[in-house]
């Protein structure tokens, strides 16, 4: 029930990664990358499907050799989500995965060979309508830029990116997006700000090598949150040294927190104190796990007492306000019922699922009416 975010998105061109629109006001796509051996087709397919189940719009797969390219062919045949092939150094791998139906190529034109080889890759991408992502990283800047600037700086990342952009411009290829990632939040943020002023292509956001599940999520939330709040960014990846599934969850949590894009339940919960009338922490933790399958956007407030509970419930899809033995249940801001504190988790799960079904049905009817 909260209003949409007052964010003015940066204007950009649009490309398509498979059937997923990127840029020009399209929903910000959330993506991840497999961390299996690509030659282990079964493990890679299983991981991609797990990512798809939690909402991944796009998945990137590393393809460092021709053996992985052959495995990519088999993987592509068994999944539905668009796949990006991550390729460095060998232009022939790019040509091979293009033949196998890749949805996007992640390359740096400067590291796959001479001008003729770059032209071959770009011509192939153009012929097959495959977009390219230019991926600049502070950890792999060109040697001359390292010498020129002494260390990675926003200006160095921008100069590297613009070299690659110029490569594609000279070849009259416009179907690309760009990233300028760094593990330092301020370096990444300022690099993206500079780049956003220079080009109108879509930007892929990320804080690279952000860290483990907790610290990486925090760094990504700060860095990506700053950029997204300024309207910068058309697709994102949260890079974690963790299960890639967590990257998707954190990515959507960042977008939900900024009210940019919603998927699933946005839980609003108090940190608890001695006033709580039921086990708020246990309830929230249990419901987050039980309700991972719900993709319907909903705000659910779970507050342990009457200090802030009623106010939060007024602006939530469903809200619980702690009371003695029984707690008040609100639906769309209206008090509807009371729930037994000793059976809170099961009761609230049932109410949330019922509300999700009701909202899904209402949307289905609306779509049918529009189509008529």
Curated annotation (Swiss-Prot):
Pathway given in the UniProt record: Isoprenoid biosynthesis; isopentenyl diphosphate biosynthesis via DXP pathway; isopentenyl diphosphate from 1-deoxy-D-xylulose 5-phosphate: step 5/6
Binding, [4Fe-4S] cluster: 270, 273, 305, 312
GO molecular function: 4 iron, 4 sulfur cluster binding; 4-hydroxy-3-methylbut-2-en-1-yl diphosphate synthase activity (ferredoxin); 4-hydroxy-3-methylbut-2-enyl-diphosphate synthase activity (flavodoxin); iron ion binding
Keywords recorded for this protein, A-Z: 4Fe-4S, Iron, Iron-sulfur, Isoprene biosynthesis, Metal-binding, Oxidoreductase
Catalysed reactions, semicolon-separated: (2E)-4-hydroxy-3-methylbut-2-enyl diphosphate + oxidized [flavodoxin] + H2O + 2 H(+) = 2-C-methyl-D-erythritol 2,4-cyclic diphosphate + reduced [flavodoxin]
Superkingdom: Bacteria
Co-factor binding comment: Binds 1 [4Fe-4S] cluster.
Gene Ontology biological-process annotations: isopentenyl diphosphate biosynthetic process, methylerythritol 4-phosphate pathway; terpenoid biosynthetic process
Pfam families: GcpE (PF04551)
Group of enzyme by EC: oxidoreductase
Enzyme nomenclature, EC number: 1.17.7.3
Cofactor: [4Fe-4S] cluster
Membership in a protein family: Belongs to the IspG family.
Job description of the protein: Converts 2C-methyl-D-erythritol 2,4-cyclodiphosphate (ME-2,4cPP) into 1-hydroxy-2-methyl-2-(E)-butenyl 4-diphosphate.
Protein name: 4-hydroxy-3-methylbut-2-en-1-yl diphosphate synthase (flavodoxin)
Species: Shigella boydii serotype 18 (strain CDC 3083-94 / BS512)
Lineage: Bacteria, Pseudomonadati, Pseudomonadota, Gammaproteobacteria, Enterobacterales
